């Protein structure tokens, strides 16, 4: 699969960038940066929505949650303080989030829309 991981900065991936990458065979985007698309909106603007409709788009709050999860892990009582335990915990959380999203709809597209739907339901 052709994979793109925008990780350097926020709001830099334009509609033209996405269209050019899709034309070159892009299949998956895993957002490493917070808010990587050049939308005014922080959550699910028009560029992100169009991209989500065309490729497998893993949203930043899943693919970029590693350090946030590490902090949450250390807030728990009596955790193992090893690299392996921390990595396994973050991997398990990310894996569960992806699996929940897939269980809602197994399509290769609209992953971010489904992930936001799940996250918002958990908050309300």
What does each model-identified segment do?
Residues 11-19, 23-26:
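Activation/maturation switch segments at domain boundaries
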Residues 1-15, 31:
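Rossmann-like NAD(P)-binding element
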Residues 22-124:
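Adenosine-phosphate binding glycine-rich loop
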């Amino acid at each position: 699969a052709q994979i793109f991981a925008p990780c350097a900065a926020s709001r830099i991936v334009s509609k033209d960038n996405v269209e050019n990458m899709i034309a070159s065979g892009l299949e998956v985007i895993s957002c490493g940066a917070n808010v990587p698309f050049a939308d005014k909106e922080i959550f699910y603007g028009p560029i992100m929505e169009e991209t989500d409709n065309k490729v497998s788009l893993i949203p930043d709050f899943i693919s970029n949650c590693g350090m946030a999860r590490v902090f949450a892990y250390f807030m728990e009582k009596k955790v193992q303080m090893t690299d392996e335990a921390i990595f396994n915990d973050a991997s398990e959380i990310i894996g569960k989030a992806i699996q929940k999203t897939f269980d809602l709809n197994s399509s290769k597209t609209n992953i971010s829309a489904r992930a936001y739907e799940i996250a918002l339901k958990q908050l309300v």
